[in-house]
A protein has these predicted regions:
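Rossmann-like AdoMet
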Residues: 1-40
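S-adenosylmethionine/decaboxylated-SAM
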Residues: 32-220
């Protein structure tokens, strides 16, 4: 299937995004209120989209697909910034088994499949491999496991993958596990907070990567 023209692709993404938030996903996990609890709300998706556009992101890594709400917001941003070179790496080991590929189907329905790479592995393995391969991204969005050690590992590898001056955005900033993991990188590696609203938090990486001395450590 040939890629859609740029204007038609952007309109399709916006239509699929609007339908997802108006009517819900085609399929849901069997838990009451699951979509509303798990999916990135539309307003926060707009914030994510606008952040990526403002930073000119053309290549984005996403950890956690679920129902696809954040992926569609990222896809909309890439329609604006990326042109034919846009690339979206989506990592989610549970997309097929837990979500019956509903998020993947939303990306396909939006006409974004040709610029999206799906990785069905845990992020600690997938991100490590991408780093080993020398992959580089302009930005990342993190909404996978919220266990502290897993958020920390995601950020550890994304520090190597996102270019200097790039952007890392995380969902559920109010979770203590997420906030604590981010605080380490703020204090020890010079990440700078970017003002956002809602439930997201965003960090800009230093223009010159900071590598602390072997003995330097700031408690977090």
């Amino acid at each position: 299937m040939s890629p859609l023209p740029a204007d038609a692709r952007l309109q399709r993404v916006r239509t699929v995004r609007a339908e997802l938030h108006a009517s819900g996903p085609k399929r849901r996990r069997p838990f009451e209120g699951d979509f509303e609890r798990v999916a990135l709300p539309e307003a926060d998706g707009d914030v994510l989209r606008d952040l990526l556009v403002a930073h000119g992101a053309r290549t984005v890594i996403e950890v956690g697909l679920a129902y696809g709400s954040s992926a569609l917001a990222i896809g909309e941003a890439l329609c604006v910034t990326g042109g034919t070179d846009a690339s979206h790496i989506v990592i989610d080991p549970f997309q097929a088994t837990a979500y019956d590929d509903v998020g993947r189907d939303a990306i396909v329905a939006a006409g974004l499949a040709d610029r999206t790479t799906f990785i069905d592995e845990v992020s600690s393995i997938a991100l490590a491999r991408l780093a080993h391969e020398g992959f580089s991204a302009d930005a990342a969005f993190v909404d996978g496991s919220h266990r502290f050690h897993e958020v920390f590992v995601d950020l550890y590898f994304l520090r190597k993958l996102v270019r200097p001056g790039g952007l890392i955005v995380l969902d559920d900033a109010a979770w203590p596990s997420v906030a604590t993991a981010v605080r380490y990188f703020d204090l020890n590696l010079g990440w700078q907070a970017v003002t956002v609203g809602g439930r997201l938090t965003a960090r800009r990486l230093p223009d010159q990567p900071l590598e602390p001395s072997f003995t330097d450590f700031k408690p977090f």
